[in-house]
Amino acid sequence: MQTEQLPRLEAGEYPGGIWYYEPHTYLPYRYVLGRVGRHPLVCIGINPSTAQPGALDPTLKSVERLANANGFDSWIMFNVYPQRATDPNDMDRVPDRALCDENLRWLRAVLAETEPTMWAAWGTLIEKRDYLPGLMREMVALTREREIPWVTFGRRSKKGHPHHPLYLRKDST
């Protein structure tokens, strides 16, 4: 049986300091964005927007605030689907399986190189596309193999989904 070669999680110098950022340049998809540390809060959202190192959007400012408030040495943003879209309605109607597989490879790399706590933060956006719940379950399964803990912040939605970081109260911890 051949072992999968994982990508190497490498920090780089970007505006605002040292960051994890994959790919290393702005493309129509993003796998990893976050601060470097051994014990990160790894936030799992639905899809990336325009954020990049040194230019965080309101969602990532909330992620950073909650990671700091809860004693994590860093944070990493991951998404169920890596396609960038400022409006989730613009996400692919059919998932690009190559993007999905590469996203899972990067998640495996993060899990192998850090001691994370996972934050379920996809909100009701998980219902935007039929394929999103299945992709989310694939990600959860990878963390279960390593017995990695999961957390949520804020109350669950009426449909039972974890809160999206953008819609948490500013005093949430």
Positions of the model-derived regions?
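Short connector loops at secondary-structure junctions
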Residues: D73-D90
